[in-house]
């Protein structure tokens, strides 16, 4: 059992205790971050005269070889080590001798693991941001091709007003764009370096914390050593942002599942992103969308777990905080996987435009436009609302729609209606006259698409 402590103990650690306490099975995931942090620490120690140039070169060469050997599969990370820190240090000493024993000068595992976690989270934020950007590109492509693809817009899952597919997909574009903004905010706020905080009270060595922070790409060192080793706000913020991403993916998945059903027939998911049934030969199931929807709860669970873990911990570091790793690793991997699969699925879906348009023409989605027609002819809106309600009842009675209701029936309810009512309630007119910024009208929709293109080019 390789561990970095034990001098004051008179008994061996119980095997069950060792296994319960060890974290090597999961914190090996950030071996690269651990070695990068150690390299920066060594550079700083040499700069400050705490290590000689020869010691620095030996240690740097040893750390580099460990990184390369693990990456290439020549060196296995095994359970004989308590954690990734002891694995790296033990292997370093084996390779470079006594110089390796100086690696931990001016450092505690408390600030070391805080650094590793920050480096890992920062790297993964960049990776997740890239996956969200890929999804936005796929959505933008759909928007560009469907500025005049009419479909019903819904409220309460009831047909409400006609919109376009570009406009509907654009709503999700906005959601995922905000998600990128949240990731950017988290990255900026967390970008302070905890290395040099020690166990909780700093160190007596003349460390240059600003130099270490600069080497590792941080904006500055953290400002309080106790907070440095006990801060997991950035983990909580990340899991919150990931939960929001999953919520957006889940909402979109729910719509795709409905749209893919025989009852809607708005889309057909590509065979490559569908599965079948072991008993029903006709089935083509939207399993990817369903799994994305299901995995949302998994990410929510990680957020609630870390909030619960942190709520009762006194300052500064406590072993409870080891529980943040597996939760965070799993949530990150889940979100990255869901984003990649979802992007592939939406990129290959076939939109059944004729069915969408036919659906928009049913369900009185143009009723509001009939009311607006009356308002434009001097009828107060509240009166117009009541008149169109009567028209809808008449259409239901006759089994027809506002597009095909005879003019005599219109005029029997209100003499204001004239022949031009049919143009006013056509799908084309209903959508095209909605020209306020953010509405589905083709002209303003094209403007938004150009803004989205510019956003993706610049971000």
What are these regions (language model features)?
Residues 1-202, 207-213, 220, 275-276, ...:
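A helix-coil-helix interface module used to build multimeric assemblies
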Residues 61-69, 232, 390-394:
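A short structural micro-motif
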């Amino acid at each position: 059992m390789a561990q970095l402590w034990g001098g004051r103990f008179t008994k061996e650690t119980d095997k069950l205790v060792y296994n319960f306490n060890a974290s090597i099975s999961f914190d090996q995931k950030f071996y690269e971050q651990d070695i990068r942090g150690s390299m920066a620490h060594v550079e700083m120690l040499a700069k400050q005269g705490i290590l000689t140039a020869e010691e620095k070169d030996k240690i740097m060469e040893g750390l580099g070889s460990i990184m390369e050997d693990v990456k290439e599969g020549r060196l296995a990370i095994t359970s004989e080590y308590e954690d990734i820190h002891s694995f790296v240090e033990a292997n370093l000493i084996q390779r470079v001798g006594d110089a390796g024993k100086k690696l931990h000068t001016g450092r505690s595992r408390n600030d070391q693991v805080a650094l590793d976690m920050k480096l890992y989270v920062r790297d993964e934020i960049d990776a997740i941001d890239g996956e969200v950007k890929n999804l936005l590109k796929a959505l933008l492509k759909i928007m560009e091709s469907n500025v005049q693809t009419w479909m019903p817009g819904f409220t309460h899952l009831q047909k409400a007003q006609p919109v376009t597919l570009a406009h509907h997909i654009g709503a999700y574009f906005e959601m995922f764009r905000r998600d990128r903004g949240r990731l950017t905010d988290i990255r900026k706020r967390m970008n302070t370096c905890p290395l040099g905080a020690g166990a909780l009270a700093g160190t007596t060595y003349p460390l240059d914390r600003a130099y270490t922070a600069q080497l590792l790409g941080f904006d500055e060192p953290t400002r309080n050593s106790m907070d440095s080793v006990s801060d997991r706000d950035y983990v909580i913020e990340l899991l919150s942002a990931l939960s929001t991403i999953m919520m957006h993916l889940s909402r979109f998945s729910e719509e795709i599942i409905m749209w893919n059903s025989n009852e809607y027939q708005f889309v057909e998911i590509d065979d490559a992103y569908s599965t079948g049934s072991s008993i029903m030969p006709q089935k083509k199931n939207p399993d990817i969308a369903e799994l994305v929807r299901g995995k949302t709860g998994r990410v929510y669970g990680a957020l609630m777990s870390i909030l619960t873990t942190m709520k009762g911990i006194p300052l500064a570091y406590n072993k409870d905080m080891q529980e943040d790793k597996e939760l965070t690793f799993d949530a990150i991997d889940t979100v990255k996987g869901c984003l990649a699969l979802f992007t592939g699925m939406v990129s290959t879906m076939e939109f059944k435009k004729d069915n969408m348009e036919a659906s928009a023409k049913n369900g009185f989605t143009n009723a509001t436009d009939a009311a607006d027609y009356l308002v434009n002819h001097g009828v107060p809106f509240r009166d117009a609302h009541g008149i169109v309600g009567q028209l809808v009842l008449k259409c239901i009675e006759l089994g027809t729609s506002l597009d095909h209701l005879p003019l005599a029936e219109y005029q029997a309810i209100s003499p204001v209606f004239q022949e031009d009512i049919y143009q006013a309630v056509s799908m084309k007119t209903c959508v095209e006259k909605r020209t306020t910024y953010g509405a589905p009208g083709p002209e303003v929709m094209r403007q938004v698409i150009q803004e989205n293109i510019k956003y993706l080019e610049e971000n």
